[in-house]
């Protein structure tokens, strides 16, 4: 029995919440984990998989988590030091969330081939005890049994992923169980990845029914109207991926995906073209570009070369390429460079990128004054490729700079702005600008400081010299502590 297909529920290190319930009594509940039907990716084969308790499993009752089971097997007892109410109790098996709030992570882990960690990967079960505190657990999540094998590939497997072509389907995320099923997902994703660590695991030379090689947890969802992508990633950078028809995933059911991983038929990887791939792509600090891709078969030794300090995430499993500069300027980063992707030394993709950085020596600012009674000022920027970027201050800071923009000065990684009327028009109407004096980061245009300070001139009058409100017009900064305003 123990050498059979053991989909054992293994726990994470979720600690019992001390003192969550007061005024209760000591209770011990005994549970049996019910078996589920195993199906292949095609037809149901009718075999059953016993789900076994692990020694460190716990359950939830009335918002309180039990002590660990202590023993592994088909039955286990769970103790509560303080539990309110009387049996029957509603029981939840949930090692990644709390009570009825289930959490299936998009990134799951398995330490070794055949050593399943379903509990730590989001396995969820429920039951109602009888009057004596006994219960049989029903499983509400679904399970993907990965059954890969190869007689050609020696590289070690570091991860396997399942993704739906329809990206609106949530295989993972956070959902609340209502007794009959799960509610809508928050933080959901259309893919799950099961990782085996940096060293990976060896592939078996053949598939088989006597042992589950690897298994991931997903929510029961209907994938029958879409395709699914199964992707195996290896330690040397090689990838094997295949597309299959989807199907409806039922609660408590296990779906077997058998894959012969072979190099014979080769493979293909194609990244979606941009609007003008012969032109460099401009990205903003904190922004990103995401391209779709198609992939199938054996793709050997994929390598990505990205600009310094940039992120280039080629995720073949999720069929995406995400490129992003850092959120802030970092010393030594490349402002312009080329992203290259190759397979087995052969080029697959090349694209020039640059980050919109306002310190570039070939950039040009145009200050738009606005109107003193109706419109705040704005800034237009022409970058080194003569591309026009309008309202750059507003886009970064979610507000306008001020009324009647007069002047700017750049020094020491800062930009200093002066506006004539600040937050109001010349007639006193509020226009909600940031102020008369504004300082921004010169690389990103992010606002550092805004003040609506008034400026006064000493003006002679019939009653003598007195300070009179005036309009600032020009600014020169000479250091972080000193500047001149006309």
Residue ranges and their predicted role:
Residues 1-8:
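Sec-dependent bacterial lipoprotein signal peptides
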Residues 10-266, 326-347, 354-388, 400-410, ...:
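Sec-type signal peptide cleavage vicinity
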Residues 267-268, 277-320:
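Surface-exposed binding patches on compact interaction domains or structured appendages
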Residues 370-375, 421-431:
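Short glycine/acidic-enriched loop and turn motifs that connect beta-strands
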Residues 378-380, 435-438:
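A short loop-to-beta-strand structural motif that recurs across blades of beta-propeller domains
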Residues 383-386, 441-445:
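Short loop/turn segments that connect beta-strands within beta-propeller blades
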Residues 388-397, 447-455:
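Beta-propeller fold detector
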Residues 399-410, 456-478:
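Repeated scaffold domains used in trafficking and secretory/extracellular systems
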């Amino acid at each position: 029995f123990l050498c059979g297909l053991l989909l054992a529920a293994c726990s994470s290190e979720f600690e019992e919440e001390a003192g969550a319930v007061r005024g209760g009594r000591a209770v011990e509940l005994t549970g049996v984990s019910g078996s589920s039907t195993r199906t292949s990716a095609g037809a149901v084969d009718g075999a059953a998989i016993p789900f076994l308790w692990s020694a460190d499993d716990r359950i939830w009752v009335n918002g309180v988590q039990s002590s660990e089971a202590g023993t592994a097997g088909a039955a286990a007892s769970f103790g509560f030091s303080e539990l309110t109410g009387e049996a029957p109790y509603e029981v939840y098996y949930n090692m990644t969330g709390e009570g009825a709030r289930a959490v299936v992570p998009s990134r799951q882990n398995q330490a070794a081939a055949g050593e399943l960690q379903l509990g730590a990967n989001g396995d969820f079960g429920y039951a109602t005890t009888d009057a004596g505190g006994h219960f049989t657990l029903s499983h509400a999540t679904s399970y993907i049994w990965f059954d890969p094998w190869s007689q050609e590939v020696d590289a070690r497997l570091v991860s396997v992923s399942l993704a739906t072509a329809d990206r609106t389907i949530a295989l993972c995320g956070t959902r609340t169980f209502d007794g009959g099923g799960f509610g809508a997902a928050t933080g959901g994703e259309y893919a799950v990845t099961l990782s085996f660590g940096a060293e990976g695991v060896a592939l078996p030379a053949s598939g088989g029914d006597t042992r589950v090689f690897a298994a991931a947890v997903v929510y029961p969802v209907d994938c029958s109207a879409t395709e699914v992508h199964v992707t195996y990633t290896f330690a040397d950078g090689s990838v094997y991926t295949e597309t299959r028809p989807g199907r409806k995933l039922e609660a408590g059911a296990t779906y077997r995906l058998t894959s012969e991983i072979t190099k014979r038929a080769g493979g293909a990887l194609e990244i979606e073209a941009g609007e003008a791939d012969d032109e460099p792509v401009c990205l903003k600090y904190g922004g990103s570009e995401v391209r779709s891709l198609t992939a199938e078969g054996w793709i050997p030794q994929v390598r990505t070369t990205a600009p310094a300090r940039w992120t280039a995430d080629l995720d073949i499993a999720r069929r995406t390429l995400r490129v992003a500069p850092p959120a802030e300027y970092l010393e030594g980063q490349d402002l312009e460079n080329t992203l290259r992707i190759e397979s087995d030394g052969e080029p697959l993709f090349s694209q020039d990128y640059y980050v919109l950085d306002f310190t570039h020596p070939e950039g040009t600012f145009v200050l738009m004054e606005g109107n003193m009674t109706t419109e705040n000022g704005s800034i237009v920027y022409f970058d080194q490729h003569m591309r026009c970027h309008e309202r750059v201050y507003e886009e970064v800071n979610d507000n306008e700079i001020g009324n009647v923009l007069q002047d700017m000065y750049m020094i020491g990684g800062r930009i200093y702005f002066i506006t004539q009327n600040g937050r109001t028009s010349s007639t006193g109407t509020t226009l909600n600008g940031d102020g008369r004096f504004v300082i921004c980061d010169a690389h990103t245009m992010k606002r550092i400081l805004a003040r609506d300070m008034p400026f006064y001139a000493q003006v002679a009058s019939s009653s003598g010299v007195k300070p009179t409100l005036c309009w600032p017009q020009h600014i020169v900064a000479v250091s972080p502590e000193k500047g001149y305003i006309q």
